[in-house]
Amino acid sequence: ALPISVPEGSLGRKNPVRIVWSWIKERKSMKEQSKKTVAKKKFFKMVFSRAGIFVILILIQLLVFLGIPYYLKEYATFIYSAMSVMEIVVLVYIINTEGNPAFKMTWMLCVMALPVIGTVFYIYVHLQLETRFVQNRLAALRMETEPYMDQDEKVTEALWASKSANAQLSYYLSHQLGFPTYRNTEVEYFPVGEDKFASMIKELEKAEKFIFMEYFIVEEGIMWDTILEILKRKVNEGVEVRFMYDGMCAFDLLPYSYPKKLQKFGIKCKMSNKIRPFVSTIQNNRDHRKICVIDGQTGYVGGVNLADEYINEKERFGHWKDTAVLLRGDAVQSLTMIFLQMWDVDMRGVEPYGKYLTKKAESLNDRLGYVIPYADSPFDHENVGEEVYFHILNHAKKYVHIMTPYLILDNEMLTTLIRAAKSGIEVIIIMPHIPDKWYAFAVAKTYYKELIEGGVQIYEYTPGFVHAKVFVSDDDTATVGSINLDFRSLYLHFENGVFIYDNPEVQKVEEDFQNTLAKCHKVTVTEVRNRGVLMKVAGQVLRLVAPLM
């Protein structure tokens, strides 16, 4: 109990109850004042943080943009006529351009709902010089690395003899995008992030030549601190260490100057696509990849980032279900080249790429099947991740089992899922039960009814959040990577994954799916119909702008 200070002799002059009550009111007033002070400090800290300043500068630019028509109101008639003509021209242009119909519909909605703002913003977006620079630079880097990504024709001949449909996918990935098909590659599947973390620590300790790491999210904690200590030690042993992470981390996960901190340890570090306080569409194209390459012999891909929730050391949305794959052998060469292409985007000149490639194995191990590491870029007009998913759905004979954290679909993917189910293929999708983004979950649920009535089975992972991005089919085909079933992953982000065929580890992917399914709740049409009105309305409204989510 807090001591009550009462002036000497006061009890004889004043009511003790009033004295105590006065003291309580004074203490309450002090607490309220303290709360207000803390709130003010938090507010100013938020406003003057990097994220706060970024938002303020963006808002200023938008206000200037919106204020221009007001100051030109005396020319309103002329401007209105000109903008009406421009609106029609832009709408005709949108209709006749190539691209996903969902994106085109969203742009048309913006232009028609807000003629002046929508029209000018569309023109501004499609004149982005920075986007064109990155697009041209990536194309040039692909040409430079092409000699190191040659396809062994003996491998493709064997694949044609084994399964011609997968050989067609192999041809597309190799000839159109430069991602060869490999054999002689061991595959190890990890059903949770903890297993991948334990394996990665062991492999990093073995590094002798170089370590390349590229991740979307990095946050200080048990996972990253452990890895960082190994990286620092390896630098002292003469190992070349390069570390790249997405610029979104500078918002609230890492200081903006964090690359300089790592560089002091001898680690070559950079942020990809830094966040800048200017209205620019390239800031919408995040580096969502998860790649780790060790000595060109060992590589990791999957959904696991470098933060404690991915290994369940920190609970955010119940149990965090994620997956990853280790590759050991020839196929790691593709991961090396994918990393170096992204690393060199903002650099001049060409690296001696050959020094990072290892000699391919001469002996052939038929038991290991076929492995195709692949990557996706928003600037090459090829939706690689989506094409891989379409391929699996269109060529399945028995089943396609899917794990994804998000379900925001265009009409083509929605139709393909339902067509597969109506063709007698067992299509099951596992979604989170505890979402990380309520708005994305609300949009996902707007697809449930149509999918379920079309024969697709939907389950929700009741222990928590599914972050895995997995397709597995017919006991012989699987893909694991960073690519979600949403517009951002399929069209806007830099992504990567690995396609696996005729490898024993595919069975383990399916076993993990069945084990996860046993912990899930099956969603019914009745359940979908009975969900809250607020979530229904929110989902339907947000679906109008789904391509932006």
Model-derived features with residue positions:
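Extended hydrophobic/aromatic segments used for targeting, binding, or gating
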Residues: 412-415, 429-453
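Thr-Gly-centered strand-to-loop micro-motif
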Residues: 403-404, 431, 461, 480-481
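Helical hairpin unit composed of two closely spaced alpha helices linked by a short loop
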Residues: 406-425
